[in-house]
């Protein structure tokens, strides 16, 4: 009778873990089944209204991803706003320079500031399984086996349903031509060795106001692949850059 009670208790706990792990994975799959894209800009850029509609584009990519289609997308987005894209920097009223620094799978805490939900199921399974030891100290071997099994169940469920976030980080500089000369003071702190810095200053005269910002675009979906995320990340970046104009 006592042996049967142990078996029933172990079976009940393991069944609960199966249900909880399955529910956690299913909940993630349902909530994240559609691709969600978010784009944020670190600073707002205000440009003076102008009848000049010429833009020079310089698009770079120093990430490890191939983004040959990004420049054409930005060009089209700017043209759709009514601007003419020129290959001559001297003839352009605006310069738009952008560099993709990083495009990769990224933890949501790093990219969006909140904790990913993908690992809770496995941790819950392991914790519940280990708790069986307190039920009966005479069945340590059985408790350990169920604990490991419960943890593995949660891990397998989470491995099948993974909450994936891809993030693209881009630095953007926009230069706006002015009618009057501008004097710009540049200061650079160059690191010397492990504890020193060399400060360099220079002054230059030009005819452009310069503005800088950072664009962070994120795509989130269950079991997301970069091949699916890349087009929408590029579209969002192109839209954000064009909307500055």
Swiss-Prot record:
Protein keywords: Cell outer membrane, Lipoprotein, Membrane, Palmitate, Plasmid, Signal, Virulence
InterPro entries for the chain: TraT_complement-R
Induction entry: At 37 degrees Celsius in the absence of calcium.
NCBIfam families: PRK13731.1
Protein function: May function as a virulence determinant.
Gene Ontology cellular component list: cell outer membrane
Protein name: Lipoprotein YlpA
Membrane topology designation: Lipid-anchor
Keyword Acyltransferase: no
Residue positions bearing lipid (S-diacylglycerol cysteine): 23
Sites of N-palmitoyl cysteine lipidation: 23
Top-level taxonomic group: Bacteria
Tagged with keyword Membrane: yes
Disulfide bridges in this chain: none
Signal peptide bounds: 1-22
Subcellular location: Cell outer membrane
């Amino acid at each position: 009778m006592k042996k049967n009670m142990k078996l029933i208790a172990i079976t009940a706990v393991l069944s609960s873990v199966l249900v909880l792990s399955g529910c956690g994975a299913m909940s993630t799959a349902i909530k994240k089944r559609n691709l969600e894209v978010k784009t944020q800009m670190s600073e707002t850029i205000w440009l003076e209204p102008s009848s000049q509609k010429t833009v020079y584009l310089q698009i770079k990519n120093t990430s490890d991803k191939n983004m040959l289609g990004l420049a054409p997308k930005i060009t089209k987005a700017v043209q759709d706003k009514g601007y003419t894209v020129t290959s001559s920097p001297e003839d352009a009223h605006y310069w738009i320079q952008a560099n993709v620094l990083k495009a990769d799978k990224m933890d949501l805490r790093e990219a969006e500031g909140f904790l990913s939900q993908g690992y809770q199921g496995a941790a819950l399974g392991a914790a519940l399984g280990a708790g069986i030891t307190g039920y009966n100290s005479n069945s340590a071997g059985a408790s350990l086996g169920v604990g490991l099994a419960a943890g593995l169940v949660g891990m397998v469920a989470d491995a099948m349903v993974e909450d994936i976030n891809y993030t693209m980080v881009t630095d953007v500089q926009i230069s706006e031509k002015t009618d009057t000369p501008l004097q710009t003071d540049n200061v650079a702190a160059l690191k010397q060795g492990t504890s020193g810095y060399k400060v360099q200053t220079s002054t230059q005269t030009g005819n452009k106001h310069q503005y800088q910002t950072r664009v962070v675009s994120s795509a989130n979906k269950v079991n997301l692949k970069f091949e699916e995320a890349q087009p929408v990340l590029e579209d969002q970046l192109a839209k954000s850059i064009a909307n500055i104009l």
